[in-house]
């Protein structure tokens, strides 16, 4: 590789990966609760292992949800429908261990510190406090149409295609578990130039030979997703490099909610505050503020104010206003970062209640986020992916 060039790699996993199964179950439960009780407080964690699903957490709601039925339906949709897959929606055990949200936490969330101290106007008094302290990042760049880094974008598309060819019977020997990984080579101007390496590991029936899997993955998955101009005779393909992937899903690995936080976001291309998303209602700023930070960053890039933008938000538990807002444009900004921070403060209400209203986060939209990325999706336009603040940002930064 020539000087001043670089490689960057991101990975994704399919909906049948055990960690992603856990995320989808947690968000399916969240959505079902929000359908009947939009103001519910939900922190739902799922563990999947051989023959067992354990759902635990803290849920405060006025409604009833049949959690075991939801679990089985979600597992069925993912594709674990036969015992020979190592996990079956009909025969798996489902255990629940649910408590209510701590009264100490609820007190600070229900009424923010500013309200308790009389520092809010009547119009602001309904503002809720942050559900926890923490820092969250959002990112956008102009590498793709959806303003995402190319490596994670392609990795997600490959994972989604891997599931699609299985469900549609195009490749009928596949099973639900799978992973993808894409290495992109960037040129001297830090622009994506070619794909250096693609890795696909996919669960399969025991009688299939690896040669057929490799041929089908290249022809029916990779070539259907990756633009041909990014592939060349030097691109390396590693298809099931262990040689065999029959045992997978919860039988092969324990799955836990929140263990794929880099897959969920930017594939390592931007920083991460450490908080997971799935199973959490929007009062949890781990989720809602990360969505808001993406919304801000994407609008800054879409407005042409920067080619690359990372936004950091930080909160204190029980306090409505963020304790800090930071913008980094990595030298690509058309205006100063200080000016961008001023514009962000003026245009976006980044209190938890403000984020919930701005992005309409009390709706049951979360299960669809739980596989193939929360950001930059081509199949679904989530509220935080809209670029409806560009004109106002431009006007505020003139």
From Swiss-Prot:
It catalyses: L-methionine + ATP + H2O = S-adenosyl-L-methionine + phosphate + diphosphate. Catalyzes the formation of S-adenosylmethionine (AdoMet) from methionine and ATP. The overall synthetic reaction is composed of two sequential steps, AdoMet formation and the subsequent tripolyphosphate hydrolysis which occurs prior to release of AdoMet from the enzyme. Its cofactor is Mg(2+); K(+). One of its GO terms (cellular component) is cytoplasm. Residues 1-21 are annotated as: Disordered. Residues 101-111 are annotated as: Flexible loop. Pathway: Amino-acid biosynthesis; S-adenosyl-L-methionine biosynthesis; S-adenosyl-L-methionine from L-methionine: step 1/1. It comes from Oceanobacillus iheyensis (strain DSM 14371 / CIP 107618 / JCM 11309 / KCTC 3954 / HTE831). Homotetramer; dimer of dimers. This is S-adenosylmethionine synthase. L-methionine binds at residues 58, 101, 253, 284. InterPro entries: ADOMET_SYNTHASE_CS, S-AdoMet_synt_C, S-AdoMet_synt_central, S-AdoMet_synt_N, S-AdoMet_synthetase, S-AdoMet_synthetase_sfam. ATP binds at residues 17, 177-179, 244-245, 253, 259-260, 276, 280. GO terms for molecular function: ATP binding; magnesium ion binding; methionine adenosyltransferase activity. Mg(2+) binds at residue 19. Coiled coil: none annotated. Binds 2 divalent ions per subunit. Disulfide bonds: none annotated. It comes from the Bacteria.
């Amino acid at each position: 590789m020539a000087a001043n060039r670089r490689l960057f790699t991101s990975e994704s996993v399919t909906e049948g990966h055990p960690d992603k199964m856990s995320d989808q179950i947690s968000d399916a439960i969240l959505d079902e609760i929000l359908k009947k009780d939009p103001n519910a407080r939900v922190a739902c964690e799922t563990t999947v292992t051989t023959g067992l699903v354990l759902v635990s957490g803290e849920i405060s709601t006025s409604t009833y949800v049949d959690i075991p039925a939801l679990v089985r339906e979600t597992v069925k949709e993912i594709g674990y429908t036969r015992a020979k897959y190592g996990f079956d929606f009909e025969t798996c055990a489902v255990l629940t261990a649910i408590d209510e949200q701590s009264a100490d936490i609820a007190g600070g969330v229900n009424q923010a510190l500013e309200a308790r101290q009389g520092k809010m106007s009547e119009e602001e008094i309904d503002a809720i406090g942050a559900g926890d302290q923490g820092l969250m990042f959002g990112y956008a760049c102009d590498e793709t149409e959806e303003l995402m880094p190319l490596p994670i974008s392609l990795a997600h598309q490959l994972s989604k295609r891997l599931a699609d060819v299985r469900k549609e019977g195009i490749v009928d020997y596949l099973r639900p578990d799978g992973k993808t990984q894409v290495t992109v080579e960037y040129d001297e101007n830090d622009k994506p130039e070619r794909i250096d390496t693609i890795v696909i590991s996919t669960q399969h029936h025991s009688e299939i030979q690896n040669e057929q899997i490799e041929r089908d993955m290249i022809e029916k998955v990779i070539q259907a997703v990756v633009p041909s101009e990014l592939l060349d005779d030097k691109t390396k393909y590693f298809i099931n490099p262990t040689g065999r992937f029959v045992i997978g899903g919860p039988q092969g690995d324990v799955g836990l909610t929140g263990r794929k936080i880099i897959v969920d976001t930017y594939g390592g291309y931007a920083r991460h505050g450490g908080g997971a998303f799935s199973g959490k209602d929007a009062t949890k700023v781990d989720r809602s503020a990360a969505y808001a930070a993406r919304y801000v960053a994407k609008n800054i890039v879409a407005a042409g104010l920067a080619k690359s933008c990372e936004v950091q938000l930080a909160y204190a538990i029980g306090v409505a206003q963020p304790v800090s807002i930071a913008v980094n444009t990595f030298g690509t900004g058309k205006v100063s970062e200080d000016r961008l921070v001023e514009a962000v403060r003026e245009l976006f209400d980044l209190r938890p209640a403000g984020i919930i209203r701005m992005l309409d986060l009390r709706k049951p939209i979360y299960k669809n986020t739980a596989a193939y990325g929360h950001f930059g999706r081509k199949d679904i336009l989530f509220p935080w992916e809209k670029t409806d603040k560009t004109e106002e940002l431009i006007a505020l930064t003139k």
